[in-house]
Amino acid sequence: MAGLVIVWVMIWFISKKELNSGIGKVSKVLIPLLFVIMAAIVIFSLTLPGHNLGIETLLTPDWSVLFDVNIWLAAFSQIIFSLSLGMAIALTYASYLPEDSKLINNVLIVVSSNSGFEIFTAFGVFSILGFMSVTSGVPIESLIRQGTGLVFIVFPTIFNTMGIAGKILGPLFFLAILFAGITSALGFLEPLLNSVCDKFGFTRKKSASILCGVGFVISMFFTCGISSYLVEIVDGFLNQFGILFLIALQCIIFGWILGIDDLIEVVNKDSVMHVGKLWVTIIKYILPGVIFIVWTFGIIDLIKTGGFLELAVDVVITLSILIASVMLTKFEDYK
């Protein structure tokens, strides 16, 4: 609980300031530090016995799962979360850019650096898994777990077997996780912060106080006895079904209602590389079509595997979000 309080106080202290003096300054420090820490971990992991086994596992494709809907849902959720797609974060940050910004260039830099960092980090993760597999005699496939299981179960076990090196590498690894979590939380909070300020005329400090207070109360549910189960359900819904559905909806709105063809000139302005008809086709037809297929088969698979409780919780979350959104909109009308 103390850790939760400290984290939310840090988030509040940073978010109550203006973008450049708050998130901007913190990101300039935490993001480079995150890269330096992960670089140290990756370089060290490549010196461990068995690292080649882990890298071989990472780079060896398993074509048998190519048509597994859960693989595609996991891939979508990973890239959506890491690039903060469909959550108004990019839109919020873009509103601060000057008129002559090279949008396409910026997008390419963000996507390339994000994907490059993830691949770079994966070499370190699988090298450490290879080391554990060799030293413990357990097949590496049995060590690979998702999300919190990998971070808070597998890696602590690995670090405990490393002796002095693990005592150095372990704190660095979890410090990197902390930095990544704080910067992600700040990013998720910023669109809500701007919306509250614009809709209700609150100061940034007051808006940050309200949102961080609500966030803290909600976070308390994830510290109870069933926290891991709640995290699994909420994370699976938000990253795999909720956000995926919103992105498909955004494609329809921007592609068919608002007229994405009119945005090409704005997007291409001042950029070295340009988008054209192919980009429009992807937004209007290909992306929503693929998402709809994956989303539908994902729901069917969830029902077939008996995930009725998970689906029920997901429905409750969805209805809660919709009701809260409608209530806030109505409240704005009567303010």
Where are these regions (language model features)?
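Transmembrane alpha-helical segments in integral membrane proteins
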Residues: 2-19, 84-99, 179-194, 252-259, ...
